[in-house]
Amino acid sequence: MTQTIIIGLAVFIVVLTVLSVYGVIPALRIVPDNTNFHFMDFRRFSFPISAVLTIIAITLYFVHGLNFGIDFRGGMLLEIQEKSGPADIAKLRTQLGSLGLGDVQLQQFGGPSNVLIRIAEQPGGDAAQQAAIQKVRSSLGEGIEYRRVEVVGPRVSGELLAFGTVGLMLAIVGILIYLWFRFEWQFALGAMVANVHDIVLTIGFMSVTQIDFDLTSIAALLTILGYSLNDTVVIYDRIRELLRRYKKMPMEDLLNASINSTLSRSIITHVTVTLALLALLLFGGKAIHSFTATMMFGVVLVGTYTSIFIAAPMLIYLGVGATRHGEDKPTKP
């Protein structure tokens, strides 16, 4: 019941937002048009706080490390097919969880009877891996067809981690290049600092909570980059528009006006994402827990804060608007 309510609220907000964008209903205004929060006053606190949190996150990473999942530690991979019909994932998870094999992940793919099983590497070499596979076969019985059985070693897992890290770095570089061409180099640098800030703090969160770091975590980090960039670009686009219109407005006032004018959109977006992630976090099960927990922290808690209190005020320190000259353009009635 709770899951249905949360998902229903998220869908309702999305529908209202789309209808308002296309003019079917009046534009949604979560905050009044004359809102004038002085966000730039907080930059004297946000930058030192973020610097301290970043140092703490890096320290936690080197002290505690990450709790690597099967994808990066190695282990066993079994592809099975239920002969009698659709596979019961919950039943299979209970059966395999009682074998004492450590981390066991199940994923349905292809048809409803196909299941991919990942089991953590067992201490004791190849003999221990084969013994674990035999335990699984005995537990699942004769009604299962084993279509693939593989043992993934540390070398392959290390390559996956390296490829994931390279992919993350290439995404950040791609974002930098994109913003450099769309805006100015100061905007690109500000967005890159904000994105790196989000990723570092999220990795620190994963280190302190010791939730599994696997391929879904890499996907979560890339998604966080996308959400953070999207929010930042919306604010930057409004800043660029106001820079062209108001040649004499002080930079702090201009940044405040830009953030205030996009505040309704930011609130609606993040409330919708929060409701969807909350439903997944509470009812999605263990299989996607790492992904949803990481997203909840990175998008909802860190991403929103970064776009407003890091990415925007960073432009002041990078000298954006310092060389403006001319008269303000008249505002259309």
Predicted regions mapped to residue ranges:
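A structural signal for conserved, well-ordered secondary-structure elements
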Residues: 1-333
